[in-house]
Amino acid sequence: DLLNFHESEHPLAIQLGGSDPVALQEASVIAEERDFDEINLNVGCPSPRVQSGSFGAVLMKQPELVRDCLELLIKTVKIPVTVKCRIGVDEMDEDKDLDKFVQIVKDSGCKTFIIHARKAWLKGLSPKDNREIPPLNYERVYRLKDSFPDLEVIINGGIETTHDALEHLKRVDGVMVGRSAYANPYPLVNVDKKFTDEVIGYQL
C-alpha cells in the first residue's frame, strides 16, 4: 500500500496533484482517513507529464482555479491544507504576478505558502534543469513575506545546511529542505537540537 507509513513519521504531509476540485476533494478525504497530518497542493512541478495533466507549475497561470481547489479542500477536511509553488513561470513578472497569485489564492482560506525560490520554465528545460538552472531569488520570497505578514511563508530551493536555514528564518516563517535531505540526511541528526534545544533519537 503506497499510502502506508510508520507511526514515527508523524507529522507527515501528503502532496496532491490535480486541477479537478472534485477529484482533489475525494483524494483529500482519503488522505485524512489515512491519518496524514497535512495536505499540500502541488503548484510547482514543471514536468511535461504533469503539465499534460493540467497540474503543477502550469497552474500558476490560473490562480482562480487554484483558489477554488484549495477552498473546497479546506471546507472538506479538518487537517491543514497548504500550497507549494514557484516564484513564477515563463514570462510571469516575479514581483507583480506573484503578488497577484498569492492575493487571489489566499482568498481560499489557505494560510501557508511554500515557495520554491526559482521560476519554472515550462518549455525547453527538463524537470532536473528546472531545479538548477533558473536562478534562486531568495529576496523575492522575503519580500512576499513582508507583503503578506498574515501568511505563513516557507522558503524552499537550494538550501543545504542548518546554517542556511537559520539565516532564512530571520526573514520567513519556515524552511523546506528537499534534495539535500535525501542526498545526505546525516547532518539532520542534530537539527532538533539546533532549532529547539531538544535531542530526539532517530534510526536510519
How would you label these PLM feature ranges?
Residues 17, 44, 54-60, 113:
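Core AdoMet radical
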Residues 37-47, 108-119, 176-181:
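Non-cysteine beta-strand/loop elements that form the S-adenosyl-L-methionine
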Residues 68-71, 76-78, 89-91, 95-112, ...:
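Alpha/beta catalytic cores of nucleotide-metabolism and tRNA/nucleoside-modifying enzymes
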Residues 48-65, 95-96, 124-138, 193:
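Glycine-rich tight-turn/loop motif centered on a GG-T
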Residues 17-19, 44-46, 86-90, 116-120, ...:
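Active-site beta-loop-alpha junctions enriched in small/polar residues
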Residues 1-37:
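Glycine-rich, positively charged N-terminal anion/phosphate-binding segment
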Residues 1-13, 45, 50-53, 78-89, ...:
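N-terminal small/glycine-rich loop or linker at the start of catalytic domains
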